[in-house]
């Protein structure tokens, strides 16, 4: 998959424990960013990618940032479509009580690349199912 550094100091995504053990590659911040409590902030990575047709990338929070500092992604998972050529930026949200600073080079999210199926809708009546219209709470506790 093609990748381009928009800034020389950008860090290429990599698997922390190797591709045989990790599904997600770490994305790093390319500059410092202070995350104020409750205020979403886009953090740049300095990277752009060319995702092949039939694939997508999903950007997800890092569990360590969430556990230790209450930093998450309000739009998780973020989707990167194959046609997008802009900079990869990560929307972070500080759910903690104090400001938290992400430093250049810090791992801020995980990116997973996967195939997807494009579908075409066929309008018409739906077949019956055992579940029917049972939605939220329909399976019990």
Task: Label the predicted regions.
Residues 1-141:
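DUTPase catalytic domain/fold
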């Amino acid at each position: 998959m093609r990748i381009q550094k928009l800034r020389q100091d950008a860090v290429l995504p990599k698997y922390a424990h190797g591709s045989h053990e990790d599904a997600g590659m770490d994305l790093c911040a390319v500059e410092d960013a202070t995350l104020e409590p409750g205020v979403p902030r886009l953090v740049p990575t300095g990277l752009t990618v060319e995702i092949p047709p039939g694939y997508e990338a999903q950007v997800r929070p890092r569990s360590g940032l969430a556990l230790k500092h209450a930093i998450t992604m309000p739009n998780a998972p973020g989707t990167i479509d194959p046609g997008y050529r802009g900079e990869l930026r990560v929307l972070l949200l500080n759910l903690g009580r104090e400001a938290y600073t992400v430093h250049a080079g810090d791992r801020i999210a995980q990116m997973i690349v996967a195939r997807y199926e494009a579908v075409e809708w066929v309008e018409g009546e739906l077949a019956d199912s055992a579940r029917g219209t049972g939605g939220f709470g329909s399976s019990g506790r």
